[in-house]
Design a protein with these regions (language model features):
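His/Asp/Glu-enriched, well-ordered alpha-helical/loop segment
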Residues: 239-315
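Histidine-rich, glycine-flanked metal-binding segment
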Residues: 1-5, 10-53
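Divalent metal-binding pocket/active-site signature
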Residues: 152-210, 226-230
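Histidine/acidic-residue-rich catalytic or RNA/ligand-binding cores of hydrolases
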Residues: 96-99, 162, 189-196, 232-245, ...
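Hydrophobic faces of well-ordered beta-strands that scaffold small-molecule active sites
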Residues: 53-61, 83-85, 113-117, 149-152, ...
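Glycine-enriched alpha-helix->loop->beta-strand junction motifs that scaffold or abut catalytic
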Residues: 80, 146-147, 194-202, 217-223, ...
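Divalent-metal coordination cores built from histidine and acidic residues
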Residues: 72-177, 243
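Di-metal (Zn2+ and/or Mg2+/Mn2+) metal-binding site signature of metallo-dependent hydrolases
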Residues: 48-72
Length: 319
């Protein structure tokens, strides 16, 4: 018998983009069944919606001006249960000391905080910064299970022109079995092909649908950015349908504290997508299953047997 059964739930099925009515059986921290179940403890949801915990696949926590525990307090009530952060802002100022600070202050939180290592400190060789992080310095961090890969590769032209310092960072990342995030605004044609061939899996810099479609057709995951500074969702609304939505995810990139308080986090992006015409189940999928698949989270991102009981309950999609 299950430890807990959530009765009469309307489940957002991110595999079929449907809303299913069923019970959810949970034992320990795992979902063990979806259907008709009884358990030691039962909670009647009376038709409320159950979604997987929301994932922000690209954010700089520093832009919130909050340390780890305070950031958790800001986003967890909005249904965010995991974030993937690139600490390049603090690393450009404080180097490894800043990176270590971010890793340490996000340990043992209810919010799962994963990291992509800052790839460009400084952003280019023309930049000046408070630190320089080379491949040798970053290499030991790939042994940390919370480190998922190499963050946005901002020096796109250095990558295309085979800068040995950049290629070594990519090589270290891929040899560790991790992934590489992209940052290549308006890169196109042969340069884009070369950039992706270097091993860059995703991009969050698309500002128009033509750019997004070119990158999508070449195999990249597209991160649809809607945060405090950059707002690209409206221009990219054609991606909120199959076959595109299964490889596109919602991210914030930067979210200032006032915006977190006033409008929320990824939940705000879902609501906006729905207002702009997206199917609610599709919008939820793009903030759950797709980022989970991109980053290799095997037990996150869906309400299904074998997945973590990492769930949120909402009355409606509008509020």
């Amino acid at each position: 018998m299950a430890d807990l059964v959530l009765k009469n739930a309307r489940i957002v099925n991110v595999f079929t983009d449907e809303i299913d009515t069923a019970d959810i059986a949970i034992s320990g921290n795992s979902i063990v069944g979806v259907g008709t179940y009884h358990g030691r403890k039962e909670v009647d949801l009376h038709g409320k919606y159950v979604c997987p915990g929301l994932i922000d696949g690209h954010i700089h926590i520093e832009s919130s001006m909050l340390c780890g525990p305070a950031f958790e307090q800001a986003v967890l009530p909005h249904g965010t249960t995991a974030v993937v952060t690139d600490p390049h802002e603090i690393s450009n100022v404080a180097g490894l000391e800043g990176l270590d600070f971010m890793l340490e202050t996000t340990k043992n939180l209810t919010l799962s905080v994963y990291f992509m290592l800052p790839s460009c400190v400084p952003a280019t060789d023309l930049d000046e910064s408070g630190a320089v992080l080379n491949a040798e310095q970053l290499r030991p961090y790939y042994g940390d299970p919370r480190v998922l890969g190499l963050a946005e590769l901002m020096n796109a032209y250095g990558t295309v022109r085979c800068d040995p310092k950049i290629l070594q960072k990519i090589r270290d990342c891929t040899e560790a079995g991790k992934i590489v995030d992209g940052h290549a605004p308006l890169l196109s044609d042969k340069d884009l092909n070369a950039y992706i061939a270097a091993g860059v899996q995703s991009d969050h810099e698309c500002s128009n649908i033509e750019e997004a479609m070119e990158k999508f057709r070449l195999g990249q995951y597209i991160m649809i950015r809607e945060g405090t500074a950059a707002k690209n969702m409206e221009a990219l609304m054609p991606l909120f349908r199959e076959p595109y939505c299964s490889r596109c995810m919602l991210v914030t990139d930067d979210k200032h504290p006032g915006d977190l308080l006033d409008s929320g986090h990824i939940d705000s992006n879902i609501r906006k997508a729905i207002r702009l015409g997206a199917d609610p189940a599709v919008a939820v999928k793009m903030a759950t299953l797709v980022p989970a698949q991109n980053f290799g989270f095997k037990q996150r991102g869906a309400v299904a047997p074998g997945y973590a009981a990492d769930l949120i309950v909402v009355s409606d999609f509008e509020s």
